[in-house]
Amino acid sequence: MVSSNFYKNLGPRKLTAIIDFLHDIIEPPKIHEDIAIHDIKILQEASPNDISFLSNPKYSEFLKTTKAAACIVPKNFTGEANPNTVLLHTQNSYFAYGKLIDFFYAPIKSYPAKIMKSAIVADSATIGKNCYIGHNVVIEDDVIIGDNSIIEAGSFIGRGVNIGRNARIEQHVSINYTIIGDDVVILAGAKIGQDGFGFSTEKGIHHKIFHIGIVKIGNNVEIGANTTIDRGSLQDTIIKDLCRIDNLVQIGHGVKIGKGSIIIAQTGIAGSSTIGKYCTLGGQVGIAGHLNIGDGAQVAAQGGVAQNIEAGKIVGGSPAVPIMDWHRQSIIMKQLLTSNSKLKK
């Protein structure tokens, strides 16, 4: 159940209004009685006043018994459902669900256009219109922050950093040596623009290499909580538009990540590697340094990548191999273990 402590329910909404809002309902059903929908709930918990959704077929059995007044389903869904539940077929039911959340809910917490008294803002910093600068934020010299941006409590914005419009920087984020585009979200605890892990070894001593690159983050990027992005040693670290980076990701110095790529939690990318456009790296993936991952490539969770990956390829395992080879290896290993167990008996 959604907590009213944190989110405001904007309902009820008429079912016809929901259909109009979603736009992409395929052959909208005729509504004989315009039902008032009060909330969004999962199939198992929905009441006759709620709407639900189905995006994963493993939950389709619950459509038979759900009490939901209506349910968003994929366009090709032909399974059984409660006859009292109105089915709304959409091109992308999960995307429609996300839109419905915005239609039904808003956060209670608001951010007035204000600089809190405890914030420290340098005289040479430029703060745009309608910005919120939270408690104990530090903004150093020559920083530029675009209009309608939010910098939450305890964050540090280092000298010369440029943040675009409509940014949301959550609590205790530190940003140095970085240029950020518009509509960027950075979740709590992220660290961006610090030195990378660069040392030269001479006579048994590891000497720090001064990093003179920066971090460049494009438009409409989200960076997860406690993720770290190092600035480049000589070439810049670059995150292109539309990327989604999960929590606890490590991005090394000089890494370049192409437009629209998705990187899942606990992934580490070593320095100077390039990730192409619209790539997907599963959880706990490791990418060695100085590699090239082609556009649209995918790496399954816990994959260890030590060689370049061609565009569009799907790999898994450690060391990573083509995904079907990895599946075969897993089956053979299981068969060997079973055979060995039988021999011992």
Curated annotation (Swiss-Prot):
Keywords: Acyltransferase, Lipid A biosynthesis, Lipid biosynthesis, Lipid metabolism, Repeat, Transferase. HAMAP family: LpxD (MF_00523). Pfam families: Hexapep (PF00132), LpxD (PF04613). The active site is at 253 (proton acceptor). The keyword Acyltransferase applies. Catalyzes the N-acylation of UDP-3-O-acylglucosamine using 3-hydroxyacyl-ACP as the acyl donor. Is involved in the biosynthesis of lipid A, a phosphorylated glycolipid that anchors the lipopolysaccharide to the outer membrane of the cell. GO terms for biological process: lipid A biosynthetic process. One of its GO terms (molecular function) is N-acyltransferase activity. It catalyses: a UDP-3-O-[(3R)-3-hydroxyacyl]-alpha-D-glucosamine + a (3R)-hydroxyacyl-[ACP] = a UDP-2-N,3-O-bis[(3R)-3-hydroxyacyl]-alpha-D-glucosamine + holo-[ACP] + H(+). It comes from Rickettsia massiliae (strain Mtu5). This is UDP-3-O-acylglucosamine N-acyltransferase. It comes from the Bacteria. InterPro entries: Hexapep, Hexapep_transf_CS, LpxD, Trimer_LpxA-like_sf, UDP_GlcNAc_AcTrfase_non-rep. Pathway: Bacterial outer membrane biogenesis; LPS lipid A biosynthesis. The keyword Iron-sulfur does not apply.
